[in-house]
Design a protein with these regions (language model features):
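Mid-domain alpha/beta scaffold segments of enzyme catalytic cores
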Residues: 1-230
């Protein structure tokens, strides 16, 4: 699965992929209203299986490409407006949905309750899910998946959280190029995370849950196939 980040990279990403590759379309550009139609056009490509990651973010980033970046309520409301439009596109084109939520649980759950559609059941994931039982209960109720990334190897709260999640709800992610898992995080500080590191994440979770890596990987793979309708 190859995620895109900005629309400028979408077409080239589609062009370089082979028949075994599927693509996720994100929607993170601040001035994005004019891009909605472009995204809708890309959704007609069969290689595109998901919209994401998309969502609501209240985190104050130290570094950003936007010089005027501020977390103000007007900006949060704008994020909500465009998230709703993207959810509608996922429903309309029967695509999976990869949700980004950072420090915005109340906003996210309220919005999802207002627009939820049965078509999203089994086709939606909380990407890099925060260790929050409110998110877990919503995901369980609506047959969503919980995404687990490299930070599970050093984030103690997530380690305890993941022990409570049924295996049939878990999918493994790398969040490449971010969130290098340990021990790479310390040994290779400053280097990009890569998809191949999914193995490290799977092995760590298996040790955490006291099960075999093979059985856990098979379950997570089956979950991913269901999520992305592969």
């Amino acid at each position: 699965m190859i995620p895109g980040f900005f629309l400028s990279s979408k077409t080239s990403t589609i062009n370089i992929t082979n028949n075994q590759t599927k693509i996720e379309l994100p929607f993170k550009e601040k001035k994005a209203k004019k891009e909605l139609k472009k995204i809708e056009n890309l959704l007609t490509n069969p290689k595109v299986v998901a919209i994401g990651e998309v969502g609501i973010d209240r985190h104050i980033y130290q570094k950003t490409k936007y010089p005027d970046y501020k977390i103000e309520e007007e900006f949060v409301e704008l994020q909500k407006i465009f998230l709703i439009e993207q959810i509608k596109l996922a429903i309309k084109y029967n695509k999976s949905l990869i949700l980004h939520n950072r420090e915005a649980k109340k906003d996210m759950l309220g919005l999802l309750e207002s627009v939820w559609d049965k078509k999203l059941e089994g086709r939606t994931v909380f990407h890099c899910c925060e260790p929050d039982f409110g998110l877990f209960e919503f995901a369980k109720k609506h047959k969503m998946f919980i995404g687990v990334d490299g930070d599970i190897t050093y984030y103690k709260e997530k380690q305890e959280f993941i022990k409570t999640i049924p295996l049939e709800m878990l999918v493994f992610e790398t969040d490449s190029p971010f969130l290098n898992p340990e021990p790479l995080r310390k040994k290779e500080r400053g280097t990009n995370n890569e998809p191949k590191n999914i193995k490290i994440i799977a092995e760590y979770i298996a040790s955490l849950l006291h099960c075999s890596t093979d059985s856990l990987s098979k379950q997570a793979t089956e979950n991913a196939r269901k999520l992305f309708n592969l």
